[in-house]
Amino acid sequence: MKAYKGMLLTCDAAVKQLILSLDERNRFIIMDLDETHLLISPDRIDWLRAELEVELEKNTYTLEP
C-alpha cells in the first residue's frame, strides 16, 4: 500500500483531456484515477488554474465587431 499527497481534481472528460495535454509539458499529475478524477501535485494547483483559464479562453467564441 502506498500513500500519496495530492489534491483530488474532478472535471468533465473534455477538461481532463486538456489537463492531460498540459501535463505533457509540465508533469504535475500524480495519478489518473478514472474518466473524471485526477490526483495532482498540490503545489501546482495555482499554476494549473491559470493555464486552464488561458486555454479555455482560447476556445471561447466572442463576437467582435
Curated annotation (Swiss-Prot):
Gene: TFB5
Name of the protein in question: General transcription and DNA repair factor IIH subunit TFB5
Domain of life according to the entry: Eukaryota
Gene3D superfamilies xrefs: TFB5-like
UniProt keyword DNA repair, yes or no: yes
Primary location class: nucleus
Subunit structure: Component of the 7-subunit TFIIH core complex composed of XPB/SSL2, XPD/RAD3, SSL1, TFB1, TFB2, TFB4 and TFB5, which is active in NER. The core complex associates with the 3-subunit CTD-kinase module TFIIK composed of CCL1, KIN28 and TFB3 to form the 10-subunit holoenzyme (holo-TFIIH) active in transcription.
Function: Component of the general transcription and DNA repair factor IIH (TFIIH) core complex, which is involved in general and transcription-coupled nucleotide excision repair (NER) of damaged DNA and, when complexed to TFIIK, in RNA transcription by RNA polymerase II. In NER, TFIIH acts by opening DNA around the lesion to allow the excision of the damaged oligonucleotide and its replacement by a new DNA fragment. In transcription, TFIIH has an essential role in transcription initiation.
Annotated localization: Nucleus
Organism of provenance: Mycosarcoma maydis (Corn smut fungus)
InterPro entries, per the entry: TFB5-like_sf, TFIIH_TTDA/Tfb5
Family (UniProt): Belongs to the TFB5 family.
Keyword terms of this UniProt record: DNA damage, DNA repair, Nucleus, Transcription, Transcription regulation
